[in-house]
Amino acid sequence: MESLFFAMRIITLLFLLINSSVFANFQMNENMQKTYIHIINLEFDKANELLWTEQKDNPTNKIIILQENYIDFLTIIIGEDEAFFTAAKDKKSDRIDFLQAGDDSSPYYLYAQAEVHLQWAFARLKFEEYLTAAYEIQKAYSLLEKNQENFPDFKLNKKGLGFLHTLVGAIPNKYQWVLSLAGMEGSVASG
């Protein structure tokens, strides 16, 4: 009887280990929180060191991609280097695909995709790719709205939606019809 119990424990442990390594995840762990602090302090070398460590130790963590995208976004916005922008924008599609392969029951699943779209929208605005930027803003908006429905207590949704509602609300009334066509609404007050 003990050997059967032992065998069941081993099988259960193997199942958990296999599932945790096979299924993609979103872990905003301590390492990723430190990385974020380095990024917002524009300490990209330190952030990249932590990202490399996380990639080695936890390669299925989808937050890595979000942080890498944030570094590229800030590099583009601050550096205004069109060559870097052109080279980096090829990564966007792969990053979205990678995030979409994640755990869709996580509040980070849609949020991370929305953040990538939003960051690229503003990078594109910087280099006058207005039509694509508008599409990306609309995509980010719809992803955040859906995530807000699914995870109403997830605070990061409120950050993104607040920003977008303020942005939408600041658009002059004579252009609000365009936003209606895109399914977007908001106001400075609601943002």
Outline where the language-model segments fall:
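Positively charged n-region of N-terminal signal peptides that target proteins for export
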Residues: 1-11
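Sec-dependent N-terminal signal peptides
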Residues: 10-19
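Boundary at the C-terminal end of the N-terminal hydrophobic targeting segment
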Residues: 22-26
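Short coil/linker segments at helix-helix boundaries
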Residues: 28-30, 38-50, 68-190
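Hydrophobic alpha-helical membrane-insertion signals
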Residues: 53-54
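N-terminal glycine-rich anion-binding loops that anchor highly charged ligand groups
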Residues: 64
